[in-house]
Amino acid sequence: MEEIKKRIIFLIDKINKTNYEYYTLNESSLNDQQYDALFRELLYLESKYPEYNYKFSPTTKIGGPISSKFHKFLHEKSMLSLNNVFNIKELKLFYDRISKKISNFTLLTELKIDGLAVSLKYKKGILDKAITRGDGYQGELITDNVKTIKELPLKLKEPLDLEVRGEVYMSYESFNYLNQIRKKENKSLFANPRNAASGTLRQLDSKVAAERNLSIFLYTIVNPPKFIITQKSILEFLTYLQFPVNNYYEYVLNWDQLIKKISYYEEIKNHLGYNTDGIVIKINELSFHSIIGYTSKAPKWAIAYKFKVFKTETLINNILFQIGRTGIVTPIAELLPTIVDGSVISKVNLHNFDYIKQKDIRVNDFVLVHKSGSIIPEIIEVIKTKRKNQIPFEMITHCYSCNTKLIKKDSNHFCFNLDCEEKKIQELFYFVSKSAMDINVLGLQTLKILFYKGFINNISDLYSLNQYKKEVEELHGFGKKKFNNIIISLEKSKNKCLSNFLIGLGIKNVGIHLAKILAQKFENIDNLQKASIESLLKIDEIGIKSAQNIKNFFLNSKNLKLIEKFKNLGLNLFYFKSKNNIKNNIFKNKKVIFTGILEKYSRNQAQNIVIELGGVIINSITNKTNYLILGKNPGSKLLKAKKFNIKVLQEHEFEELIK
C-alpha cells in the first residue's frame, strides 16, 4: 500500500507541474498522450484507493494557475474542460451511459481545434471583454489582443448582451511564416501553432498580436436565448451573427452514424490547414444537459475523442549523452530535423541503454517518431527494412565529463564522482530552477560560463558572486546591467520559503510536495536536521526509504557545512507560517470558497494559504460551507452565501485573520 500511495503522490506532483507548464507557461514537459496516460492512471488509482484521495489532486481541478502578467477576471460560468476517450471501445461506454439515462437524443460532432480557449463578452453588440480559460474559474483579460483577429466581429449585427466561447488558433500557413521571420531575426522558433497562438495572445503589445494573424472558431453561447434549444442551433445562430464557426460539424442520429462520422474526420484532418487533435461529441438537445449533469471538472454530456497519434519517419544522426545532477547518464538521439504537427523535432530521449537494446536502436537508423502537441517525441519503432550496415550501439563505459567509470544500477548508468563538473553544473541549474530558488536570470549557459571561469563551484558560491563583480561584468554577453540583475535576483531569493530551499538541496525523494510537508512539520532547518527516522515516519507521506534518505543527507558532514554556510549568507531557513503558532488552526477542517478577484493575492496563492492553515477548498456553496472569501466583482456565490447564512470575509478581514 505504501508503494500505491507513493505512486499517487508522484502522479499528482507530475500532473500539477505539467498543468502549470501548459496553462501558465505555454510549454509542457509531457506530450498529450503521456499526460493523458498519467491522468487516467491517477483517476484509476484514486477510485480504487479512496483513502489516498488528496485535496490537492489535479483530478479536482480544471487547469493551471493564472499568469501574473494580465488583469484577472472571474468567469460567471466556469470554463470546464472535456474528458477524453482514445478508442471506439471507450467511446461506446460514453454512448451507453447516456443511453441508459435518456432516450431519443441526438448528437453533434465538432472538430477539436488545438488552440487556446477564450470567452468573449459583448455588451449591446460591442465586444467588451476577452478572457482566457485560466484555471477554469478565473482567466486573464486579453481583449486588445483578441480584437486583432481579423475575422472576429467587434460589433454584432444586433445590439445583444452575449457571452460566446471559442478557440483561438494559428493556421499552419501563418505559423510557418512567423517562424521564417523569427529565424531571419535569430529569434527562437515556436514549437507548434498552439504555442505560437498562446504566446501571441499573451503579448503585452497588441501590435505584435496583429502582425501574427491569429484566427478563431466560436462554438458555444453561455446562457443562450430561450429560442435556442440545440447545440446545432447555437452554431447556426453564431453563424447568423457573423461569427467564424467551423463548418465541419455533423448531426448524428445513432451509434452507427457516429462511427461513420469518425472515419470521415480521420480522412480530412490532415488537409484542413490548421491543427486538430480530435472530435468533440455533444448531446445536441440542450434540455438534456442538466439531466446528464457535470463533474467538477467536465460536463458528462460531452466527450473528446482523440485521434490516433500522428507519426513521422526520420533519421538518427547520432546518439549523445547528458548527465543529470544525480549522476544518471541519459542517451539522447540526435535526429534529422523533422516536423510533426507543426513542431520541429531534432532530439529524442532514449532513457537508458536497456531501452536502446530492447528497441535495437542504432546510429543512422530510420525510425518512426510520434508526438501529440509537445516537442518531446518518442521513437515508436525502428524501420529495419531500411537498415544497411549500421552497427549495434555500445554504451559508453566512462563518464564523458570526468572520465570516471560508470556504474550500472537497475536499468541506468551512473557517474558517482562527486567532483564531476557536469553533475555540479546540473546541481546549480536545479538549485536556481523555478520550483526551488526561482533565480530565472541564471540560465544553464550562464551557469556554465560562471562555473568554467571559476567563479562558482557549488550552490553556496552563487551568493558570493559579488566578489567577482569586475571580472564577471567584463565577460562577453554580461556587462553591468546583467550582473546587477543577477545579484538582485540572488538577494531576493534569500527570502524564499524553507520548502524552496529544501527542493534546491536536491535531497533524494524530496520533491515539491514532500518539501512543503517537511517545512510545515519541522518549521526550520535545525529541527529537520535533528529529526529521527521514527519522527519522519510519523508523517503519512514518508516511507522508510524517504526517511532514510533525509536522515542520511543530514548526517553527511559536507551537507552540514553547506547548510551552515547558507545560514551565514543570510538565507531564510524557516517556514514562513511558523512565526505565529496561534493561527495554525484558524481554518482547520473548515470548508472555504472564494468569489471575485483579490487585490493582493492570486486565487491560487490565497487557496494555498487556506490549505496551509488546515482548511479545505471547495468549488460550490452548500449549507456546510464555513467561509466565503470575497473579492472584487463577485459572482453568484455571494447570493448563495447570504441564503445559507455563511460567514463572508472581505479581503482585508481575510488578511487580518491570517496575519
UniProtKB/Swiss-Prot annotation:
Cytoplasm among the record's keywords?
no
Instruction: Identify the GO cellular component terms for this protein.
Output: cytosol
Which positions in this protein are listed as binding NAD(+)? D32, Q33, Q34, Y35, D36, S81, L82, E110, R133, E167, K282, K306
Names of required cofactors: Mg(2+); Mn(2+)
Where Zn(2+) is bound, by residue?
Answer: C399, C402, C415, C420
Question: Which keywords belong to this entry?
Answer: DNA damage, DNA repair, DNA replication, Ligase, Magnesium, Manganese, Metal-binding, NAD, Zinc
**Would you kindly state one Gene Ontology biological process term found in this protein's UniProt entry?**
DNA replication
The answer to keyword Secreted applying to this record is no
Protein known as: DNA ligase
